[in-house]
């Protein structure tokens, strides 16, 4: 009995009036990691942009593991000193459905003598974990997934697992049809398809879609060659005939994919393919057929069942009948739940003696992770900058997802009603933090606990903390906070513990804070020389708050400036009066007479002196005048 039958030829049978119409080119971005300039690579001379949008890391020369790896000369690796989570944050990506592919590389340095093992996530969902030996397997030197990017960005992160530094050769973001690989119930924008394998069967070789001259809307898939499923298990077939119904919407398979095949033999009539998979996962299996065997010319000549992990998914498959003729593409799709570690596909002949297959695709179905509230992510990023958070923390990507790699020091909780993660705790004590605590911390509205003790944080305690009403524990002890305690802390009605000891705070503890704490919470204000006003601290009495001290200092300074200004004005006025009196005295009659007498006396003295001087000159020598 057929458990499920999703026939992709139903989509193909309309044959593509849609695909025959001109479509705009799909969005495509290729990044050559570590490169300082754009490059093109043969044989298609694809354009790779220089390295952009990375959060850190080190550029280096690259060693390409296999021949299918793009022939690029550089990579970017992320040493553990830069933190466990490093990302590429790519912006201005049009809303749509994408194939995202990341090629890995090996650092071309003697000190890097082993392949790194690490995890990869896209938009907060982990899609791949590298396994030992990946660098020698063609289909393991990259990770690929089909994902909807709806927020205008693509965040691709690499998570250290303690086995070497993640090293990335290239990143590709290639747009595909919005309905590509729709597998029916359960498919949608919240689903990611991770490529487990793609095989082209028969005499063909490993190729990309572009090698097949496939449609760009196919996403330039890589097809790994499968020459045989086992010794004496099959024989190859090939043709140069045109294949109908191949490169059509929404998947746009290349025609060349259907021009080779494997056919079972008399020794082993069943065609069997097995793939190692992760247990307790769902997989989407796509089987490709085209009747290219010259010995099969009519309906009923070749009929077989498709059995996956012991269950019959498709009964009485007759390719010619179902595709509409010879040399026509047929695609069958099934969703399979696998409890063990092996997925096995068996084609069991019922008529004609042999089964045939052209290509196989297997995807792991992954439910996209819920993301953290955007405002809270933004607030944490501003805190990271304001506090000078060391790079070893690796605060990149989403703080809560993937759940296997949350940010160190940030505690997360999922709100099932809104399907969003939020931050309910900060544990960053004794981490060498400096700088100041920004007002944006109040945007973490779900915080229940803040522990920033034993750092070197300066400045005032943000008054905005009073709006985080869920806060139960606030420990800012042994820092360098100064100024007064904000009165808004009295609005924290859920507060159980308040530790502000070991800082440089001053002024009176606000009544709203002290009164509530005396009755409901544990508190510690010691080792703040300027604090006063509650039991255990000096009485405020003559003590002045820092605000009052500033006010007094300002008043004294202003009074001094006024006194100086008045003194200068008085002095200038006095000078002007004296000058006016002198001028008036010279203009009086008695003053003129005295001036004439004085002038006559001076002239007489002057003449007498001149006479004496002339005589002395004659006596002393010849005159200089003739």
Curated annotation (Swiss-Prot):
It is found in: Cell membrane. Its main location: membrane. The chain crosses the membrane at residues 550-570. Glycans are attached at residues 61, 282, 333, 417, 451, 482, 524. It is a single-pass type I membrane protein. Residues 23-549 are extracellular. One of its GO terms (cellular component) is Golgi apparatus. Residues 603-626 are annotated as: Disordered. Residues 571-626 are cytoplasmic. Keywords: Cell membrane, Glycoprotein, Leucine-rich repeat, Membrane, Receptor, Repeat, Signal, Transmembrane, Transmembrane helix. Residues 1-22 form the signal peptide. Belongs to the RLP family. This is Receptor-like protein 4.
